[in-house]
From Swiss-Prot:
Domain-level remarks: The DHHC domain is required for palmitoyltransferase activity.
Cytoplasmic-side segments: 1-31, 86-174, 231-514
Compositional bias segments (type: Basic and acidic residues): 505-514
UniProt-recorded name of the protein: Palmitoyltransferase pfa3
Lineage: Eukaryota, Fungi, Dikarya, Ascomycota, Pezizomycotina
The species this protein was found in: Emericella nidulans (strain FGSC A4 / ATCC 38163 / CBS 112.46 / NRRL 194 / M139) (Aspergillus nidulans)
Lumenal-side segments: 53-64, 196-209
Function: Palmitoyltransferase specific for VAC8. Palmitoylates VAC8 at one or more of its N-terminal cysteine residues, which is required for its proper membrane localization.
Transmembrane segments: 32-52, 65-85, 175-195, 210-230
C-alpha cells in the first residue's frame, strides 16, 4: 500500500513559453525608429524650405523685396526654429517621480529622496487628493499622467506627436518659441516665393526650363497652408501663456478643493444641537483640557502618517465601513446622509464652475514665469522657467472667490442648523405641554431633562365608573330594590321556603347582566 501511495502520478508540468529575445529587440527598435520619424520629417522639410528660399534670394531678381537680406532672414529663422525644436524634443519636461534608482533590485522602484511638501488646490473627481496609481506617486497641481510616455508630467500641456514627447514645465518655453519661429519662417518663405513667382515667372520665361520654378511653387503652397494653420495654433498658445493656462486646463474642467468641506464636517458633528454656541464659556477646565489634547494631536499628526492623519496621495476614507454603518445606523439615517452628501457634491460643482482660474497671476507675471526674469534669455530656447512644479501660487481673485463661497456656504449651514434647533425645541415643548409647564429658559437640547419638578397628572373628570354600563333594573341593596320587595311580600309569602333559591336566582340574573 505504501508503494501504491508513493507511486501516484503527478500532474504534468508544461514548459513556459518565453518570448524570443530577438523578437522583443526588433519590436523595441521599430518603436524607436517610428518615434524618430517626426523628427526626420521636420528636419528634412525645413532644410528643403530654407534651401529653396535662399536660392531664390541669391539669384538676380527685379524685385527689391528679394535679395541677400531675405536669404539671411530665412537662414536665421531656420536655425532658430531647429534649435528650439531640438531643445523641446530632448529636454525632460519634468516628472514628480524624479530620479529613481535603476537596476533589477527588488526595491529599485522605491524613491530615494523625500518628496517636497506642497499645498494642493486641485482635487480628483471624488474630491480627494490627486494620486497616480500607475506611477504610485502623488500628483501635484497641474500634473497629469501621459499614457504614451507612461509617466506623470509636471504642468503637462499636451503630448505632441511632432515632438514625440510631452510638453510640460521644462520644455514649454522651447515649444512656444518653436511655434513662433516656424510661423515666421513659413510666412517669409510664402512671401519670397509668391513675389518671385509674380515678378519672374509671369513676366519672363527664362526659368521655365529648370527645376527652380517647381520648388518655388511648392514652397509657396506649403508655406501658405502651414503658415496659416500654425499661426492660429501659435496665437492660441500665446493666449494660454498670457492667461496662465495649459491646454488640458483650457479644454477640461479643473476641480478645485472645497473651501469649507472640513469646516462643514466639524460643525455637523460639534454644533448640530447647539453645543458650539457663541455664548458658551470657553474658559472652563474641560474646554482648556480639550484644547490641550487637540494641540498634542496636531503636534504628533506627522509622526504616523496614515494613522493620525490621512497620508498624502491617498484618499481619506470614513472611519466606519458601509457594513458597520448599516449595523450602527438605520436605513433612514443612511439614506438621509446619502441625500445630504449628493446635495453637497452638487453645490460643490456649482461653486467650482463659478471659481476663476487659480493660477492666473496676470499676463506679466505669467510670461515672467514662462520666460524667466532675464530679458536676454527670452528669445533663446533655454530652460529658464521658474518654479519646481510642486508649489503654485494662487491668484488673489481665486482666494477672494474661495473666501466668498466659504462665507456663503457657512451662512447657509448656520441657517439650517438654526432651523433644526428651533424645530427640535418646538417638538420638545409640544411633547411636554401636558405637564402643565414649559422648558427652562436656559435649557439647550444637549442638556438632560430634570424630572424632579414633575407634577402629578391632572384629573380629567371622567372615571371608569362613569364609562361602565348600567342596568335599567335596580341592583340588590339599592333603595328602589328594597321598596319593590316590600310591595311584593304578599306575592312571596306563600313561597317563603323557597326565598333563598329565588334570591340566588336574582343574583345570577344580575351577574349575567354584568
Amino acid at each position: 500500500m505504501a508503494t501504491l501511495a508513493m507511486s501516484t502520478p503527478s500532474s504534468p508540468t508544461w514548459p513556459k513559453r518565453r518570448p524570443k529575445a530577438w523578437a522583443m529587440r526588433c519590436e523595441r527598435y521599430c518603436c524607436a525608429a517610428a518615434s524618430y520619424f517626426p523628427l526626420a520629417f521636420v528636419y528634412s522639410l525645413t532644410t528643403w524650405a530654407v534651401y529653396v528660399e535662399a536660392s531664390v534670394g541669391l539669384k538676380p531678381s527685379s524685385s527689391s523685396w528679394i535679395g541677400l537680406p531675405s536669404s539671411i532672414l530665412g537662414v536665421v529663422l531656420y536655425l532658430a526654429l531647429n534649435i528650439s525644436y531640438t531643445t523641446a524634443v530632448f529636454t525632460d519636461p519634468g516628472s514628480p517621480l524624479g530620479a529613481r534608482s535603476g537596476g533589477g533590485h527588488p526595491y529599485s522602484a522605491l524613491p530615494i529622496t523625500e518628496l517636497p511638501e506642497y499645498t494642493s488646490y486641485t482635487v480628483n473627481s471624488t474630491g480627494g487628493s490627486r494620486f497616480c496609481k500607475k506611477c504610485q506617486c502623488p500628483k501635484p497641481d497641474r500634473a497629469h499622467h501621459c499614457s504614451t510616455c507612461k509617466r506623470c508630467v509636471l504642468k503637462m500641456d499636451h503630448h505632441c506627436p511632432w515632438l514625440a514627447t510631452c510638453v510640460g514645465l521644462r520644455n514649454y518655453k522651447a515649444f512656444l518659441l518653436f511655434l513662433i519661429y516656424t510661423s515666421l519662417f513659413c510666412w517669409v518663405d510664402f512671401g519670397v516665393s509668391a513675389i518671385w513667382i509674380w515678378t519672374e515667372v509671369f513676366n519672363d520665361t527664362r526659368y521655365m526650363d529648370g527645376i527652380l520654378p517647381v520648388n518655388v511653387v511648392l514652397l509657396s503652397i506649403l508655406g501658405g497652408i502651414i503658415g496659416l494653420v500654425l499661426t492660429g495654433f501659435t496665437a492660441w498658445h500665446i493666449s494660454l501663456a498670457t492667461r496662465g493656462l495649459t491646454t488640458i486646463e483650457c479644454l477640461e474642467k479643473t476641480r478645485y478643493v472645497s473651501p469649507l468641506r472640513k469646516a462643514l464636517d466639524r460643525h455637523r458633528y460639534d454644533g448640530l444641537l447647539g453645543t458650539n454656541t457663541g455664548g458658551e464659556n470657553q474658559d472652563t477646565f474641560g474646554s482648556r483640557l480639550q484644547n490641550y489634547g487637540n494641540q498634542i494631536l496636531d503636534a504628533h499628526a506627522n509622526a504616523i502618517p496614515g494613522v493620525t492623519r490621512p497620508e498624502e496621495g491617498e484618499e481619506s476614507s470614513d472611519n466606519l465601513t458601509p457594513a458597520q454603518q448599516a449595523l450602527s445606523r438605520s436605513y433612514a439615517d443612511l439614506e438621509r446622509q446619502r441625500e445630504h452628501d449628493r446635495y453637497e457634491d452638487y453645490l460643490a460643482e456649482l461653486d467650482n464652475e463659478k471659481m476663476p482660474h487659480a493660477f492666473d497671476l496676470g499676463w506679466k507675471r505669467n510670461l515672467l514665469h514662462l520666460f524667466g526674469d532675464r530679458p536676454l534669455h527670452w528669445l533663446v530656447p533655454t530652460p529658464t522657467t521658474t518654479g519646481n512644479g510642486w508649489e503654485w501660487e494662487p491668484s488673489r481673485k481665486f482666494l477672494e472667490a474661495q473666501e466668498r463661497v466659504r462665507q456663503q456656504r457657512e451662512q447657509v449651514a448656520e441657517q439650517q442648523r438654526q432651523h433644526q434647533r428651533d424645530l427640535y425645541l418646538r417638538n420638545m415643548n409640544n411633547s411636554r405641554a401636558w405637564l402643565g409647564n414649559e422648558l427652562p429658559p436656559g435649557w439647550t437640547p444637549d442638556q438632560p431633562l430634570s424630572h424632579s419638578d414633575d407634577v402629578a397628572r391632572p384629573a380629567t373628570g371622567v372615571s371608569m365608573k362613569t364609562l361602565a354600563p348600567r342596568s335599567p333594573r335596580p341592583r340588590p341593596g339599592e333603595e328602589v330594590y328594597a321598596e319593590d320587595l316590600d310591595k311584593d311580600d304578599f306575592v312571596l309569602e306563600p313561597t317563603r321556603g323557597k326565598g333563598s333559591g329565588n334570591q340566588s336566582s336574582r343574583e345570577d340574573d344580575w351577574r349575567d347582566w354584568d
